[in-house]
């Protein structure tokens, strides 16, 4: 169960949620402590609670589309788009989208690479909420936000299932609202 913290704009993991997260040292590379959300999401109703927590925080915000980052961002992004009744745009790894695509570079705490979006989906004034599973250093989310702005879109905010506060990733994300269903 996820317990909301009043007036924080985020939620905290209660004791059972903390126990459900698994940690894998040195994955995917040395020096990284990987936080695995899969066991937490396997709990009955957990995904619904995450989506409800984020949806309540963006209530009243104008959002045209959720941009969800490949692949675990799709977990939150698709469910949230359905709940909010807005569009859903996939931000994919190279070679996963057919047709014309636009690409941009990103870097995070353990890698760098390229992401792609189907050409023509983001246009002038499209209000986008960027969704991913985890906010660590903010590199992927920042690059995605910069891409949206380069296409004439606007950032309505950023949404994450889990935020690792000690890495201070939210400092990288403009002045747009940052919503994390859980923090650790």
Swiss-Prot record:
Q: Which GO terms describe its cellular component?
A: cytoplasm
To which pathway does this protein belong?
A: Purine metabolism; AMP biosynthesis via salvage pathway; AMP from adenine: step 1/1
Q: What does this protein do?
A: Catalyzes a salvage reaction resulting in the formation of AMP, that is energically less costly than de novo synthesis.
One Pfam family from the UniProt entry?
Pribosyltran
Location in the cell reads: Cytoplasm
In terms of CDD domains, this protein maps to:
PRTases_typeI (cd06223)
**Which cysteines in this chain are paired by disulphide bridges?**
none
Enzyme Commission numbers on file: 2.4.2.7
Q: Kindly state which reaction or reactions the protein catalyses.
A: AMP + diphosphate = 5-phospho-alpha-D-ribose 1-diphosphate + adenine
Q: Which UniProt keywords apply?
A: Cytoplasm, Glycosyltransferase, Plasmid, Purine salvage, Transferase
HAMAP family the UniProt entry points to = Aden_phosphoribosyltr
Which GO annotations describe the biological process of this protein?
adenine salvage; AMP salvage; purine ribonucleoside salvage
Which family is this sequence assigned to? Belongs to the purine/pyrimidine phosphoribosyltransferase family.
Q: What is this protein called?
A: Adenine phosphoribosyltransferase 2
Which enzyme class, named as a word? transferase
- Origin species: Rhizobium etli (strain ATCC 51251 / DSM 11541 / JCM 21823 / NBRC 15573 / CFN 42)
Q: Which InterPro entries match?
A: Ade_phspho_trans (IPR005764), PRibTrfase_dom (IPR000836), PRTase-like (IPR029057), UPRTase/APRTase (IPR050054)
Q: Show the GO MF annotations.
A: adenine binding; adenine phosphoribosyltransferase activity; AMP binding
């Amino acid at each position: 169960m996820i317990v909301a913290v009043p007036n924080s704009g985020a939620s905290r993991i209660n004791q059972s949620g903390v126990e459900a997260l698994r940690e894998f040292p040195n994955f995917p590379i040395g020096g990284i402590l990987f936080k695995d959300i899969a066991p937490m999401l396997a709990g009955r109703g957990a995904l619904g609670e995450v989506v409800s927590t984020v949806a309540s925080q963006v209530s009243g915000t104008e959002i045209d589309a959720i941009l969800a980052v490949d692949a675990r961002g799709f977990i939150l992004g698709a469910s949230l788009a359905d709940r909010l009744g807005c569009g859903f745009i996939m931000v994919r790894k190279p070679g996963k989208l057919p047709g014309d695509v636009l690409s941009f570079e990103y870097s995070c705490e353990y890698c760098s690479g390229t992401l792609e979006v189907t050409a023509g989906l983001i246009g002038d004034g499209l209000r986008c909420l960027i969704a991913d599973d985890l906010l660590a250093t903010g590199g992927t989310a920042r690059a995605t936000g910069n891409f949206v702005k380069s296409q004439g879109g606007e950032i309505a905010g950023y949404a994450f299932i889990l935020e690792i506060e000690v890495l201070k990733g939210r400092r990288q994300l403009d002045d747009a609202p940052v919503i994390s269903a859980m923090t650790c």
